[in-house]
């Protein structure tokens, strides 16, 4: 299947000069969504994984069915204040300010092998923060998977030597 034909391009969103890749059009197509998840699971089949972690919010949409298909647990990396229990937090720099990701204490145990899943690799800031958060818990990132990688933004430079797999590579 040509997954790129299922991704809508929205120019100048969320601000002028940005070409936003909207995955909701792929998600609305049941066949395309299933095949995309199956293909991502296939890309990750050689990773030795205990749990899948995914950042809010679109990471949840891909991470949950992948965890189910792979028979693994799912760990949600949330924005601040969204978790009801005690959380571990990691703050990171955005273009215009700071943000944070949090995970429940004990959701990722020391030594857990973690596959990090998100929808789009653009600047790499969110996923790099996810890597640092997982490391804070004692977990080990064994791979990172994306539906889409936007080329030309050098995001992989922020991810070090972690194995990265992507279903689609599109121009930014």
Curated annotation (Swiss-Prot):
What is one GO biological process annotated to this record? AMP salvage
Show the coiled coil region(s).
none
* Reaction catalyzed: AMP + diphosphate = 5-phospho-alpha-D-ribose 1-diphosphate + adenine
Identify the keywords attached in UniProt to this record, alphabetized.
Cytoplasm, Glycosyltransferase, Purine salvage, Transferase
UniProt pathway annotation: Purine metabolism; AMP biosynthesis via salvage pathway; AMP from adenine: step 1/1
Q: Which CDD domains match?
A: PRTases_typeI
Q: Where in the cell is it found?
A: Cytoplasm
Claim: Heme is one of the keywords in the record: no
Q: Name one Pfam family in it.
A: Pribosyltran
Record note on quaternary structure: Homodimer.
Protein name (database record)? Adenine phosphoribosyltransferase
* Organism listed in the record: Desulforamulus reducens (strain ATCC BAA-1160 / DSM 100696 / MI-1)
């Amino acid at each position: 299947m040509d997954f790129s034909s299922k991704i809508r391009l929205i120019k100048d969103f969320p601000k002028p000069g940005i070409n936003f890749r909207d995955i909701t059009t792929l998600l609305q197509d049941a066949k395309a969504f299933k095949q995309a998840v199956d293909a991502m699971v296939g890309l990750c089949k050689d990773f030795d994984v205990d749990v899948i972690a995914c950042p809010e919010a679109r990471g949840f949409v891909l991470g949950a069915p992948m965890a189910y298909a792979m028979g693994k647990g799912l760990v949600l990396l949330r924005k601040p204040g969204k978790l009801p229990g005690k959380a571990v937090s990691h703050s990171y720099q955005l273009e215009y300010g700071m943000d944070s990701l949090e995970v429940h204490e004990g959701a990722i145990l020391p030594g857990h092998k973690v596959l990090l899943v998100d929808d789009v690799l653009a600047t790499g800031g969110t996923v790099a923060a996810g890597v640092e958060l997982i490391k804070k818990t004692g977990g080990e990132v064994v791979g990172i998977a994306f539906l889409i990688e936007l080329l030309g933004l050098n995001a992989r430079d922020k991810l070090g030597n972690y194995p990265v797999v992507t279903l689609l590579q599109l121009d930014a």
